[in-house]
A protein has these predicted regions:
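Terminal export/targeting leaders at protein ends
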Residues: 1-85
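Membrane-inserting effector segments that mediate pore formation, membrane fusion
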Residues: 77-100
């Protein structure tokens, strides 16, 4: 999938922002950018992105939210809400940082 912001690593950019600023950016993300983040999350869940035991332990805390985030029937607004939830984005970003 082509990046919605050519030349910009969205995950790395969001990871560097403060929590408040990240929430503001996630709130105005385009549909394509949101799909990119959701796809990365799905790849972590499916095991396509190798994760260490400590990363999996961190993700396990957010299991229900991760499954809802990657669900086909989850609305765009709900996905944005889930990504802003405490710790969820950081757990996913930490798991995909070596690949993305």
């Amino acid at each position: 999938m082509a990046s919605p912001l050519p030349g910009v690593n969205l995950m790395a950019l969001l990871k560097q922002l403060s929590d408040a600023l990240r929430a503001d950016v996630i709130e105005v993300l385009s549909k394509e950018a949101l799909e990119e983040l959701t796809e990365a999350t799905l790849n972590v869940i499916l095991g396509n992105i190798p994760s260490s035991p400590e990363q999996l332990r961190s993700l396990r805390r957010h299991k229900q939210d991760l499954l809802e985030l990657t669900g086909a029937k989850t609305s765009e607004a709900r996905r944005k809400e889930l990504l802003q939830k405490g710790g969820l984005f950081r757990s996913v970003a930490h798991a995909v940082e070596n690949v993305w």
